[in-house]
Amino acid sequence: SLLFALVALYSYFLGKKSFLSFGIFLIGITVLRLLAFPIGNSMRLDVPLFSPNLYADSGIFSSLGNLLLNNLYVFLFVLAVYIMRKQIAKLKRELPVALKYIFTAVLVILPVIAGVYIHETFQSLINNSNITLEIYRIEELDIYSILCYVSYGLLFIAFLLLLQVALMMTSLSGRISFLRTKYLLVYIFIISAYTLVAISYLGYKKEEARCRMWTNRLSVERD
């Protein structure tokens, strides 16, 4: 039922593309996310996706299922902002000068917030889960690994869309587009390098801490 409600909200928003439908869509997906949280918690013992044995952090990131739903929520929010980019640009032109600068600053800050969110949650996923993310360990990859890659793939797309919206608010709008092939290739290279370094470094530190823990435990048992 939540999925049908989401499809209905998105269809309504896509059909209208107004600030009213934009607001209704954001309120709607927020309500759906809040409703999904207790439902997910009630399945902690029955569904591995929501089990703390697979992944657990604090608050709204208490399970992998909640993490993936949070990521989906962020992606849908950004997608809605991108769909409204022309209306947003038009609104900016109609604002007084003072408000125009504030409006632009908010849109420029959004990619920064998104970047911090991606980095922090990705770091949390590596440090607080038993999910294999290293591509070279292909035989150990499972459905949860794939779900994580798809989820963060959507977040990296969302980050790119936010950069494009922020660019539209500057004097470079019309001359540069991050969606052109050469910029996309550079972006893909940067994201690939980031994920590779993050997974390798944090995975190594995690394994090092685990080995140190076992070493300490063995030394205590010998004593």
Residue ranges and their predicted role:
Residues 175-191:
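N-terminal signal-anchor/signal peptide hydrophobic helix marking the start
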Residues 1-177:
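Juxtamembrane segments at transmembrane-helix boundaries
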Residues 117-120, 191-223:
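Juxtamembrane extracytoplasmic/periplasmic/luminal helical "stalk" adjacent to the first N-terminal
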